[in-house]
């Protein structure tokens, strides 16, 4: 190991950094807007939906087809938000582990 570093100390530091990253992801958010501003979804780094905003100016509740479209847009917005949140979390973990989480058997030790 470089500089005679203690592997256990390095592992403990990595675990501590990962715990801190997990904690910060709880308060970090990502935002997705779909349908030309019809729907906005905000989700945390832990994939918890924080808010869903529906813009009443673009919605025609008397149009049955629009209601179906609105449901489809909502599903798309939530799914895109989850994907962005997962990517944000993966980036954070990759920065800490440097890819070590991909080593079989080691991932469980890191978090």
Indicate residue ranges for each PLM-predicted region:
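Long amphipathic alpha-helical segments used for membrane anchoring, targeting, substrate engagement
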Residues: 1-31, 83-111
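Residues at secondary-structure transition points
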Residues: 2-5, 61-72
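Residue-level signature of catalytic and energy-coupling elements of molecular machines
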Residues: 11, 47, 74
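N-terminal hydrophobic or amphipathic segments with adjacent small-residue motifs
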Residues: 30-31, 39, 71, 75, ...
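N-terminal intrinsically disordered, cationic/polar leader segments
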Residues: 33-50
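Short, acidic/hydrophobic/Gly-rich beta-strand patch recurrent on exposed beta strands
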Residues: 53
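A short acidic/small-residue loop/turn micro-motif
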Residues: 56-59
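Short, well-ordered alpha-helical segments
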Residues: 66-86
């Amino acid at each position: 190991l470089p500089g005679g570093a203690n592997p256990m100390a390095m592992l403990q530091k990595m675990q501590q950094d990962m715990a801190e990253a997990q904690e910060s992801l709880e308060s970090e958010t990502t935002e997705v807007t779909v349908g030309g501003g019809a729907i906005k979804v905000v989700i945390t780094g832990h994939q918890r939906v924080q808010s869903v905003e529906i813009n009443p100016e673009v919605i025609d509740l008397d149009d049955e087809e629009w209601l179906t479209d609105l449901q489809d847009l909502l599903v798309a917005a939530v799914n895109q938000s989850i994907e962005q949140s997962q990517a944000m979390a993966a980036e954070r973990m990759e920065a800490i582990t440097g890819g070590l989480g991909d080593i079989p058997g080691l991932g469980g030790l890191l978090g």
